[in-house]
A protein has these predicted regions:
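Catalytic "initiation/cleavage/transfer" segments centered on a nucleophilic residue
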Residues: 1-46, 113-214
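Signature for HUH/AEP ssDNA processing cores
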Residues: 36-97
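Generic hydrophobic secondary-structure signal
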Residues: 52, 56, 105-111, 126
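Eukaryotic short linear interaction motifs
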Residues: 61-63, 100-101, 116-117
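Histidine-centered divalent-metal-coordination microenvironment in nucleic-acid enzymes
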Residues: 92-114
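Generic alpha-helix signal with a bias toward terminal, lower-confidence helices
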Residues: 63-68, 103-105, 121, 203
């Protein structure tokens, strides 16, 4: 997605987004459009939707691939797993490759809020499936208990390390529904930000999403 339209406006389709005209921080309109489509579709399908974020990283020292095959394989397996569990998942993900953080993926996931109320099982399942995708050996803590590698960031802290919430229940009958929806849209717009330090290979796919159900 090169040479795409960038917006520096404060809103997209009436929803707040993460932009700053003075600092020339913009968002890619094509990704905002996809976010809008997926969030609208999920809110039409379910009167309660659980919105959550997570990031996917590779372990230190792991050879970072130049393609998206491992992430695509993981995400497909994870979404199939959540579908079989009855959560009717929908997602949008973006690849980011910077010199500081290397290759990683940002994901926004939406689930049927009648079937799930918190993020923890989904994060743990993602951890297990991502480690399996990477063929990582089992890891134990000091007490020899099985533990995870911590490669799925549950986004419970912001970039400054301060605690932040994750897992917002969007209930259509909630008087705060529009405000919460807008806050989720704004948080999701982080996936559309223009990364000035992006070092992704050209012609490499950077956006992944579930299909809109008609």
């Amino acid at each position: 997605m090169r040479n795409e339209r960038i917006t520096y406006e404060e809103q997209y389709q009436g929803h707040p987004i993460m932009t700053d005209k003075e600092k020339q921080l913009g968002c890619k309109e094509a990704i905002l459009q996809k976010i809008d489509q997926i969030m609208t579709d999920m809110s039409n399908r379910h009167s309660k939707v659980l919105f959550m974020r997570y990031d996917v990283r590779f372990p230190k020292g792991y050879g970072h691939p130049n393609d998206n095959e491992l992430f695509s394989q993981f995400q497909e397996t994870f979404i199939k797993n959540r579908k079989r569990a009855g959560y009717d998942p929908a997602y949008i993900a973006v690849r980011e490759c910077s010199r500081e953080k290397h290759q990683h993926y940002h994901v926004a996931l939406m689930l049927d809020g009648h079937k799930t109320q918190n993020i923890h099982d989904h994060i743990q399942t993602a951890e297990r499936l991502w480690e399996k995708t990477l063929n990582l050996p089992p890891k134990n803590d000091d007490a020899r208990r099985t533990t995870s590698y911590g490669l799925i960031d549950d986004c419970m802290r912001n970039r400054q390390g301060q605690p932040q919430g994750n897992g917002v229940m969007l209930r259509r009958d909630d008087p705060e529904y529009k405000h919460k929806y807008d806050q989720c849209f704004r948080r999701c717009s982080y996936l559309a930000k223009v990364n000035q330090k992006d070092s992704s290979p050209k012609h490499q796919r950077e956006v992944f999403s579930s299909r809109i159900q008609h």
